[in-house]
Amino acid sequence: MQTILFHPDAAACEALERMTQRLDDVTVLCASCEELFESGLMADGAVVSSGNGFGIMDGGLDGVLRALYGERLEARVKRQIIEHYGPELPVGAAVVARSEH
């Protein structure tokens, strides 16, 4: 499995490079969320977002994902949380929602 870490700030990318230089399966890219998704690198991959326990995707990486993949993605995340955990996703738990792209 290949892991891609990304950040738009060059100094942050340099720090990530230093921390992961011995890890063969980690790639650091200096790019914004939009640039990363538009590059096609994520075509067959998965995106992990820490999000929040209610599935509200209105800012940060979640906001970018909702803007790119639509409000239906947010609805699927919320539905997964409710179906599997009730009104709130417990700390440490996760749900999987397809982007349909």
Model-derived features: positions:
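Macrodomain-like recognition of ADP-ribose-binding/processing modules
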Residues: 1-101
